[in-house]
């Protein structure tokens, strides 16, 4: 049906599979300290999972949609070779005017200058571009990271002694790639 005022909502039509593990280890004990019982406890947890699309109707293989084999949280981007060191170095490098927003917005300097990021020409066509943004033609785009948190862990410490109770809990994530957004 026609939708007025907004785009139609996305369909929940993908099949996916999540695989992972959880590990929890705990130790508690007590002993006498100055003729009084001292109880202590230590606990550690570690968990990880990966979610992958197993079925989705994306016949063109558009990389900005779900596709079979996609891991949730994928970050597609350009590979960085370094920085342009001089204002003329761009002459010996693949054209990147399509992907450099500073060049697109600046009417005075229409080429990369010293300090601009130098992207790698992965498809060898002397132009940095997104191709068709499909799996079969991603241009110079590649998977450069994943925003899904990996290896969540926690540590729980505590003791009881002579009417005094102490407990501390720490948690964190050991790996996560961060993407500031397309406008940064």
Set out the residue ranges of the language-model regions.
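Membrane-embedded beta-strands that build the outer-membrane beta-barrel scaffold
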Residues: 1, 19-29, 40-48, 153-159, ...
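Residue-level marker for the onset of beta-strands and adjacent loop->beta junctions
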Residues: 9, 53, 153-155
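Conserved small-residue
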Residues: 11-17, 21, 30-145, 178
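Short, glycine/acidic-rich beta->alpha junctions
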Residues: 146-153
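C-terminal beta-signal and adjacent terminal beta-strands/loops
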Residues: 52, 125, 143, 160-184
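Small-side-chain secondary-structure face that scaffolds active or pore-lining regions
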Residues: 2-18, 39, 169-184
């Amino acid at each position: 049906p026609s939708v007025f005022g907004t785009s139609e909502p996305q369909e929940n039509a993908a099949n996916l599979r999540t695989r992972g593990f959880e590990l929890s280890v705990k130790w508690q004990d007590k002993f006498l300290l100055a003729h009084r019982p001292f109880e202590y406890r230590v606990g550690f947890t570690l968990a990880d999972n990966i979610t992958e699309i197993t079925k989705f109707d994306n016949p063109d293989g558009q990389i900005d949609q779900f596709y079979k084999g996609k891991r949730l949280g994928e970050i597609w981007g350009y590979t960085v070779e370094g920085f342009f060191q001089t204002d003329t170095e761009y002459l010996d490098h693949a054209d990147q005017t399509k992907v450099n927003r500073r060049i697109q917005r600046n009417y005075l300097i229409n080429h990369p200058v010293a300090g601009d990021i130098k992207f790698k020409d992965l498809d060898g066509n002397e132009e940095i571009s997104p191709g068709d943004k499909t799996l079969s033609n991603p241009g110079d785009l590649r998977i450069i990271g994943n925003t899904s948190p990996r290896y969540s862990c926690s540590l729980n410490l505590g003791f009881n002694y002579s009417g005094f109770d102490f407990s501390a809990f720490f948690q964190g994530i050991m790996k996560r790639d961060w993407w500031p957004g397309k406008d940064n």
